[in-house]
């Protein structure tokens, strides 16, 4: 499953995604990972959620992020959920390219059984919007 929330900056995407990760980790029988472009959630996420900063791995394109996410799935057979915040900042993509990226990740999800959750900045959406791919 691939789902994402979108909205303008400051509408609460990060907080919503972090809360979803915490709730998921409480009920998950496997591992949960939170990917972000900063360490700002270091003290907000519990220790059973692994926080990964994309800056540490020089991830700056859709190809890099896709390969990184595939590597996470390949290296951890107990991985159930991956949460990715600041997706458009990491990828510097337009909305159209985000849709293409989500389709690729959907194929990864179907092949691995890992659920992916993204926060996407959309300058044209004033409220939080939830979508599944």
PLM feature spans:
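Conserved P-loop
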Residues: 1-71, 127-129
